[in-house]
Structure formats: C-alpha cells, structure tokens
Swiss-Prot record:
A single active site specifically recognizes both ATP and CTP and is responsible for their addition. Magnesium is required for nucleotidyltransferase activity. Nickel for phosphatase activity. One of its GO terms (molecular function) is phosphatase activity. This is Multifunctional CCA protein. The lineage of its organism: Bacteria, Pseudomonadati, Pseudomonadota, Gammaproteobacteria, Enterobacterales. Comprises two domains: an N-terminal domain containing the nucleotidyltransferase activity and a C-terminal HD domain associated with both phosphodiesterase and phosphatase activities. Catalyzes the addition and repair of the essential 3'-terminal CCA sequence in tRNAs without using a nucleic acid template. Adds these three nucleotides in the order of C, C, and A to the tRNA nucleotide-73, using CTP and ATP as substrates and producing inorganic pyrophosphate. tRNA 3'-terminal CCA addition is required both for tRNA processing and repair. Also involved in tRNA surveillance by mediating tandem CCA addition to generate a CCACCA at the 3' terminus of unstable tRNAs. While stable tRNAs receive only 3'-terminal CCA, unstable tRNAs are marked with CCACCA and rapidly degraded. Its cofactor is Mg(2+); Ni(2+). ATP binds at G8, R11, R91, R137, R140.
Length: 412
C-alpha cells in the first residue's frame, strides 16, 4: 500500500497559496484492508474512506469508463492493480493531475508542473470531453487563477467548444450549474467565468439571458464601452472589488437583463429596462433553482438600480416608498446591498472605474434618517391600528425631507 497527496492541495502549495482541503490516493489496497486499518467508508459509487484521526478523504486508486450520458454516466474500477498514473489520468486538468509522496517528491506524469509554470489550464486526456461538468470547472478555475495570469490552452478551449456544440451541457442538472456558478462568484475575478463560457459557446446554452446582452448597444455618452454584455462583465468585476457577498455579485450580474428585450429599432435607448428585467431574473433563477434570498435581491436591483442613480431628484415620499418596496424595515442589509450594486453599475464603465458615487452615500444617510424615527412615539401619541403605519410614514417622510434639504439638495 502506498499513499499519495493529490490534486488541489499539491497544486496550491506549488503556487504558494494556502491549502484548505487535502485529498489522498491509496495505491495497492482493497476496501477491506482500509476498513481493517480503521478507515470509515463513505463513498457509495466508488471506495472513498475517512481517516480515523484527521477525517481527511482517502480514495482507492481508480479508473473511470464512460457508460452513459452526462457527468454521472461513468463506471468506476478500483483495484490494487490500478496505478497512480492510471488514477491521475482520469483527472480534468494537468495541474490537478499532480501527486506528492511521503518524501515530498512530486509525481508528474502529464506535465502539470510545466503547465503550472506556464500558467496554462490544459486537459489531461481526450476523456475530458466525456464529462460536461468540466466545461464549468475549467471556467471556474480560469476565474480563480486569473490574478496569477492563467489562461486556457487553445486545444482545451477547442474541446470545450466541441462539447458545447455536441449538446453535452444539456445533461447538466440545474443544481450542478448553480453550484459551479456560485463557487465562481466567490472568486477574485468572477467575470472571467462568464467570459470563458461565452468563448466556448456555453453562455448561450446555460445563461441565454446574459448572452443576449452582447451586441446590444447603449448610449455612448453614458456607456463608452457601448456593448451591454461588456458592461455587465465590467460591473461584475467592480462588484467583486466592492463586496465578497455572492448575492451582491449575482444581483449586479443580472441588473441589466431587461436591455436584452429592447427592440433593435429603439436602440441604443432602453427605457423601462429595469422593471422589464425582473421577469428575466425570475426566469433565470427558477431555471437554475437559485436560492430565494439571492433571487429576491437580484429582482430588486434590476427594478430599482436606475432609480437610485437619480437619488438627488427623488422627493422624500418616493425615498420612503423605496425603503418600503425593498422591505428595508425588516431587511435593513438590503440598503447597503443596493448601494453597492448601484455603485458597481456606475463604476463598471470604461473610464469611470474610479468615479465617486455620492448617491450611495445619500441612500445610506437617508435610510439612517428614516429608520431613526421612533415607532414608540407614534403609539404613545395615541395612534391606533392602520393609523400607526400612516403616521409613521408621514413622520419618516418629514424627517427625510428635512435631511434632504440640508444634505442632498435637488440639483438645479
């Protein structure tokens, strides 16, 4: 029996990154030998065991053979005669097909070290094309390591295109698509994930609402980048700089979906695109089974981001109504989330990356003023039932009006 550290732990250590999870491959052993040694079996479809002390995963070396459609259609073979090289060959990328023995020596049968050095994401073998989930995984790796200068090898991108055009991605379940997307949204450069999907044709298949934005022009006066798809990825990049929250990043990604519905004869204007985009947000989220909390914020951002841009021109009643509409009294975090997504929208434009966004500050300040109006004082004043709500709203509007006159005057 020989045990090797494999995959991401080896890769990230060589890149000088922190290692979170460690996976091990056991060569020359059987399930019974692992159980006799105190390991606990957890894999149903293939033999994976938990170490009795560390609880890290130890998998018997195995090979996989395509036996059906999609990413689950594989037959696994694990036996003592499966070599380390056999096991590493079934992995997706050469940089993930590295192993380290107990002496610290790196085993590299597929030139993963060379690709690490050259910052290349390259598939190990043609078997890559048998698993459609790998298209998303490579896009996610491209986003995760973009800041280190990694790019996808030409032949791997070609294979990803072939898989997409062959209809392989249609076998992916919504849950797996969302899981990979959610993980990509946590990376430093989530926009790279969607750009890679577009480069291989997968964006049109998995995210048609986003793909439809490319080639749709916006007024050059407001959008020097002109293309709405490019603007969308720029805003996502900016959102990633402003917030680590997946819901903020996803909402920013979806903020302009309504522009994809504008008839070409009305281009480059997109009047009413915000409310129009709400249905597309709902459609996308329902299809991918996006969690409700993330979906709800994306709907609100699509509907209200343009309104927040005009904050100095809003009257106090409209401002308080905005807080009502986003349910800020019960979910106050939404004020900050809308401020961040709206700022990402403004700064996600060519030449505006460092622009100030005072509307965000005013939105936050206006909220502090509105929510500081005490409910208790209204009740003590003798108001009852629906009168409490009406009087509370009236006092909030008055407080916001007083604040706005001093801090956020309406422009001439």
């Amino acid at each position: 029996m020989k045990i090797y550290l494999v995959g991401g732990a080896v890769r990230d250590a060589l890149l000088g990154l922190s290692v979170k999870d460690r996976d091990w491959v056991v060569v020359g052993s059987t399930p019974q030998e692992m159980l006799d040694a105190g390991y606990q079996q957890v894999g149903r479809d293939f033999p994976v065991f938990l170490h009795p002390q560390t609880h890290e995963e130890y998998a018997l070396a195995r090979t996989e053979r395509k036996s059906g459609s999609g990413y689950t259609g594989f037959t696994c073979y694990a036996a003592p005669d499966v070599t380390l090289e056999d096991d590493l060959k079934r992995r997706d990328l050469t940089i993930n097909a590295l192993a380290q023995d107990d002496n610290g020596e790196i085993i590299d049968p597929y030139n993963g070290l060379g690709d690490l050095q050259n910052r290349l994401l390259r598939h190990v073998s043609p078997a890559f094309g048998e698993d459609p989930l790998r298209v998303l995984r490579v896009a996610r790796f491209a986003a995760r390591y973009a800041h280190l200068g990694f790019r996808i090898a030409d032949e791997t991108l070609t294979l990803m295109r072939e898989m997409t055009h062959a209809g392989e991605l249609e076998h992916l379940t919504p849950e797996r698509v969302w899981k990979e997307t959610e993980s990509a949204l946590t990376t430093r450069n989530p926009q790279v994930f969607f750009q890679v999907l577009r480069d291989c044709g997968a964006l049109r298949v998995l995210f048609p609402e986003i793909d439809a934005l490319f080639g749709v022009p916006a007024p050059a006066r407001w959008h020097p980048e002109i293309d709405t798809g490019i603007h969308t990825l720029m805003t996502l990049s900016m959102a990633a700089m402003l917030s680590p929250q997946v819901d903020v990043r996803f909402a920013t990604l979806c903020h302009d979906l309504g522009k994809g519905l504008t008839p070409p004869e009305l281009w480059p204007r997109h009047h009413g695109h915000g409310p129009a985009g709400v249905k597309l947000v709902e459609q996308l989220c329902q299809r991918l089974r996006v969690p409700n909390e993330i979906r709800d914020l994306a709907r609100l951002v699509a509907e209200f981001h343009d309104l927040i841009h005009t904050f100095p021109m809003l009257n106090p009643k409209t401002i308080v109504k905005l807080f009502d509409s986003i349910d800020a009294w019960r979910k106050p975090q939404r004020v900050e989330q809308l401020a961040l997504t709206s700022e990402a929208d403004v700064r996600g434009r060519t030449g505006f990356e460092s622009a100030d966004y005072p509307q965000g500050r005013w939105l936050r300040e206006g909220w502090e003023v509105a929510q500081s109006v005490p409910t208790k004082a209204v009740v003590e004043a003798g108001f009852k039932g629906v009168e409490i709500r009406e009087e509370l709203t009236r006092r909030r509007i008055a407080a916001v009006a007083s604040w706005k006159e001093q801090r956020c005057p309406k422009p001439d």
